[in-house]
From Swiss-Prot:
Membrane-crossing residue ranges in chain numbering: none
Presence of keyword Hydrolase: yes
Alphabetical UniProt keywords: Hydrolase
Organism: Rubrobacter xylanophilus (strain DSM 9941 / JCM 11954 / NBRC 16129 / PRD-1)
Record-stated family: Belongs to the UPF0173 family.
Protein name: UPF0173 metal-dependent hydrolase Rxyl_1261
GO function terms (MF aspect): hydrolase activity
InterPro entries: Metallo-B-lactamas, RibonucZ/Hydroxyglut_hydro, UPF0173, UPF0173_UPF0282_UlaG_hydrolase
Keyword Hydrolase listed: yes
NCBIfam families hit by this protein: PRK00685.1
Domain of life assignment: Bacteria
């Protein structure tokens, strides 16, 4: 069932909110690269290897910390909002593609659409100062097989998640459940309901003490809502579609 849905795509969880998506044709897409200082990322996976695209939902360190070094190392194109794109260009990264909410761009063999997210966004520069990072967003990534994955980024639940479901029909949602600075498991269950998805990977929990939400709480709230969900609790380093 899951293999059929993925259509040859592989999804590797690298910890926190970082995922590598590998297309059937071998293209590699990294979402929210937080690797070197990520306590959840297995040491052997902190070097990403070949990479084509980097998607950045917002500028906070736990989503953006390794975007520039990885882009330098691999030559991957960084896709992010205008402010983050401008910043990475100022740091010498030539391959940068601005994308904003509601816009869709073809990047290699996939289509990437920017979606709304309710959070904050700032960039901590190398000298320790903080600059404006534009507005946060999520992404819907559509593969040539028709498989669609929604990475919500950091966000609260919001009513227009229903619209994301209606317009794009994601098959799989990667949803934060950590609470306090992102959705709680309770809100994440309602996000799954609004999106109308059947498959969810919980993310952005347990990395730091202020992210106490758990997959068990998420599963309980989903069950109380009567949702028929397949919840894929992935350990860092695990892969869907292998």
């Amino acid at each position: 069932m899951v293999q059929e849905m993925l259509g040859g795509t592989r999804i590797t969880y690298l910890g926190h909110a970082t995922f590598r998506l590998t297309t059937p044709g071998g293209e590699n897409i990294l979402i929210d690269p937080f690797l070197a200082d990520n306590p959840q990322t297995p040491e052997e996976l902190k070097q990403v290897g070949d990479l084509d695209t980097i998607l950045v939902t917002h500028g906070h360190f736990d989503h953006f910390a390794d975007a520039i070094p990885v882009a330098r190392q691999t030559g991957a194109t960084v896709v992010a909002n205008f402010e983050i794109s401008s910043y990475v260009q100022s740091q010498g990264i030539e391959n940068s593609m601005p994308l904003n909410k509601g816009g869709t761009a073809r990047v290699g063999g996939v289509k990437v659409t920017g979606t709304n997210a309710f959070h904050a966004s700032s960039i901590q520069t190398e000298d320790g100062s903080t600059i404006y990072g534009g507005e946060p967003m999520g992404f819907v990534v559509e593969f040539e097989s028709g498989f669609k994955v929604y990475h919500a980024g950091d966000t609260a639940v919001f009513g227009d998640m229903r619209l994301i479901g209606e317009l794009y029909g994601p098959d799989l949602a990667l949803l934060p459940i950590g609470d306090r600075v992102v959705m709680s498991p309770f809100e994440a269950a309602h996000a799954a309901r609004l999106l109308g998805v059947r498959h969810v990977v919980p993310m952005h929990y347990g990395t730091f003490p202020f992210l106490p939400g758990t997959p068990e709480e998420f599963e309980r709230h989903a069950r109380e809502l009567g949702l028929e969900l397949e919840i894929h609790v992935m350990k860092p380093g695990e892969e869907l579609g292998s």
